[in-house]
């Protein structure tokens, strides 16, 4: 499996050279085999990217994350329908019943709140709020009709970052929000790459239904992985003023962090891949035996 996340800052040009990414920067050239790469994060508004490289990125199912002048991810380029049975997958996806989708969302939401509870326990936060999240996850109905996910998130963020904290996605965000937004965007890009690689159409979600969002399914499935970013931001950015380059690199490198998936220890990227595979098996065959999500407290960098 491809594993490398390449972070390119202030380069002049990125192009293809013999199935390698070639980066030209300050009179020097750097090459990375495309077969090793899962994601490229590009910063710097003057970078030129050739069409031949973009075509090769699609062929190798490599996601390209583009950042603005404030270093915030603003776009994702990824392959579409690269799976050898894309039409079969699409037909299956369009035939998912509402009951199947509601049950899948119930499972995903359970994993998300379970990880939020785990994060609060890791940082020895209020036992009352930890118990409240535990109650919320047990109350989740198919389709989360009572919005336990929304209630849990409010309790979670207020407890983790303080009652004055408000989640915002605007560019004027404080360093905590900027870190969360950056990390979530990287996770989203990786999930989009994996979802497309398995022939799933990101437009057709199990819960999200925004007609303007091509990543509805991606946004559904990535929910239990957001807490990996939350832990890193809490550990590293609470006393910082700006989201400096070294912190952006750290957030990007979260995809390579080691975490437990079932009985196996693997990278976050591999865990995401296994998770999507398990989701497909569950929703297609009603077999939940492989549909797991890693628990955040098993992250090895904190041990």
What are these regions (language model features)?
Residues 2-5, 9-12, 59, 71-303:
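Active-site helix-to-loop segments that bind/position phosphate- or nucleotide-bearing substrates
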Residues 8-51, 55-56:
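N-terminal ordered "arm"
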Residues 35-85:
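Glycine/small-residue-rich interface belts in oligomeric ring/scaffold proteins
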């Amino acid at each position: 499996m491809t594993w490398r996340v390449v972070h390119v800052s202030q380069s002049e040009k990125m192009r293809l050279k013999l199935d390698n990414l070639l980066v030209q920067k300050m009179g020097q050239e750097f090459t990375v085999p495309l077969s090793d790469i899962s994601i490229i994060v590009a910063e710097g508004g003057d970078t030129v990217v050739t069409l031949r490289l973009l075509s090769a990125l699609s062929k190798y199912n490599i996601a390209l994350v583009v950042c603005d002048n404030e270093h915030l991810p603003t776009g994702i380029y990824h392959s579409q329908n690269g799976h050898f049975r894309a039409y079969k997958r699409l037909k299956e996806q369009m035939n998912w019943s509402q009951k199947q989708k509601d049950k899948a969302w119930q499972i995903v939401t359970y994993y998300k709140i379970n990880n939020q509870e785990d994060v609060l326990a890791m940082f020895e936060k209020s036992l009352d709020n930890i118990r409240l999240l535990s109650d919320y996850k047990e109350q989740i109905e198919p389709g989360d009709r009572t919005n336990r996910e929304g209630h849990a998130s409010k309790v979670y963020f207020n407890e983790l970052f303080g009652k004055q904290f408000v989640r915002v996605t605007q560019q004027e965000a404080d360093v905590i929000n900027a870190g969360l937004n950056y990390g979530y965007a990287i996770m989203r890009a990786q999930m989009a790459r994996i979802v497309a690689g398995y022939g799933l159409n990101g437009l057709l979600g199990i819960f999200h239904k925004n007609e303007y969002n091509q990543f509805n399914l991606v946004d559904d499935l990535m929910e239990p992985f957001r807490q990996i970013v939350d832990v890193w931001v809490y550990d590293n950015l609470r006393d910082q003023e700006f989201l400096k380059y070294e912190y952006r690199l750290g957030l990007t490198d979260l995809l390579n962090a080691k975490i437990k998936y079932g009985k196996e220890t693997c990278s976050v990227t591999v865990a995401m891949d296994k998770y999507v595979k398990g989701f497909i098996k569950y929703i297609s065959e009603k077999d939940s035996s492989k549909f797991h999500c890693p628990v955040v407290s098993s992250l090895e960098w904190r041990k």
